[in-house]
Amino acid sequence: MFMLPKYQTFWVFIMISSLIPLLALLISRLLAPVSKGPEKMTSYESGIEPMGDAWIQFQIRYYSFALVFVIFDVETVFLYPWAMSFYELGIFAFIEALIFVFILIIGLVYAWRKRALEWS
């Protein structure tokens, strides 16, 4: 059974939700004055001029922790629509979801063994 008509509303929503921000950026680009001055190149911190160098280096553990978070956050984005249409899709989709979750568990075990989840 081909389910394309069920997803037409979804694709229209995706196109419109992609078009609106692009139009907003285009209109602001056309209407905003272009000024390249020293004020535009400064960093803004709550209306106060920054003291010292505004650029700092973060430790690598912040990046690895954020990367693991993003991976598992995207996992929930993929699993939510599957859970909402669980009864319609049948056993084949259930097995596919189990394989997907199993691959993610392997990734979690790998990150755990590499100590990517430890803060110290």
Swiss-Prot record:
The chain crosses the membrane at residues 7-27, 64-84, 89-109. One of its GO terms (molecular function) is quinone binding. It is an enzyme of class 7 (translocase). Its EC number is 7.1.1.-. GO terms for cellular component: chloroplast thylakoid membrane; NADH dehydrogenase complex. The keyword Zinc does not apply. NDH shuttles electrons from NAD(P)H:plastoquinone, via FMN and iron-sulfur (Fe-S) centers, to quinones in the photosynthetic chain and possibly in a chloroplast respiratory chain. The immediate electron acceptor for the enzyme in this species is believed to be plastoquinone. Couples the redox reaction to proton translocation, and thus conserves the redox energy in a proton gradient. This is NAD(P)H-quinone oxidoreductase subunit 3, chloroplastic. It comes from Psilotum nudum (Whisk fern).
